[in-house]
Amino acid sequence: MTRFPPAPVGATVSRLHRLYREQGQSPWLDNLTRPYLRDGTLAEFVAAGIRGVTANPTIFARAIAGSDAYDAQFAALIAQGRAVEDAYWELAAADVVDAAAVLRPVYDTSGGTDGFVSIEVAPELARDTDATIAAAGRLHERIARPNVFVKIPATAEGIPAIADMIGKGVSINITLIFSLARYEQVIEAYLQGLEARAARGADLAAVRSVASFFVSRVDTEVDKRLEHSGDPEAPALRGRAAIAQARLAYRIFQDRFTGTRWETLAARGARVQRPLWASTSTKNPDYPDTRYVDSLIGPDTVNTLPEATITAFEDHGTLTRSIDTVPAGAAAVLDELAAAGIDMDDVGRTLEDQGVAAFHQSFADLLTELRAKAHQLAQR
């Protein structure tokens, strides 16, 4: 059974608790698996300061393929004549419902700000607006819990689906954001959705959203391009793109959620769409293991963390506001990258395509494995 690491000697409150209480940043767990629900591990994470859970098709694929905890339910569904893909959604929905129950006290005590768990629409719908809208609506109705986000990718086709779902009162986690331009579109979709609800006289207070801005993958891609750039200044720019871009995203967040337009919505009960820092594990072993936590601390944000990063942060992470302490420096880094021939918009497009493809492949591989398992059950 996985156990949360103890706090350092002499500590009375975990760093995760302090991160929220002192800095206003909510730490979430980037993993969901049925054994964690059954053996109490998720509850332990929550007691230690975790305030939400994220998952994606790769996480669900790893959870279902790597555990026998799903076998009995899957066998029962197949025996009922359910299609394999429909059986998958039943497995995933069951985990999300159970996780939402564990997190419900956090949701209630935070006034609906935290305590969320996410479930993503099928990855093959990432380039289909109408199908995404239909699938998101079905997931929302199927799970029917106030503290569940439906995840929609921030593709060009996903943007209008986000506005549509927000307008219908569905809380959305927008995922796979890799560029500032796309982030601007995500915020605009959220505001348009709220304005559509306001025009109908509908409640705005119950609609929540986070914008999942991916971090470490940006450095991985940019560092690779810097290695081949031939620019003599390139080595000094390695490992700087992701944090700089995320800090500029936070500035956009601050700008867009102030002013007359936002204040009109806020007066009707609307809540800000918080930036969620995703992909915050360190991919490059040369970088500190808490790099993408320590450097992005600030109020009204979320950081979703895999277990190893949680352990590292609890052991030696910092608790100092860092997201906007050097505002001019972030823009200067992107200027230097542009001078070195790095096109950040192209980086964003590349990573979006890779992210969509990776989730699609994970989902396809899982369905292949489940079909094989269903075939084995049919032979018994």
Indicate residue ranges for each PLM-predicted region.
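Flexible, acidic glycine-rich loops studded with aromatic residues
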Residues: G269-H375
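N- or domain-start disorder-to-order transition segments that initiate the globular core
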Residues: T2-G40
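Generic structural signal for well-ordered alpha-helices
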Residues: L42, A93-R104, I133-G137, I162, ...
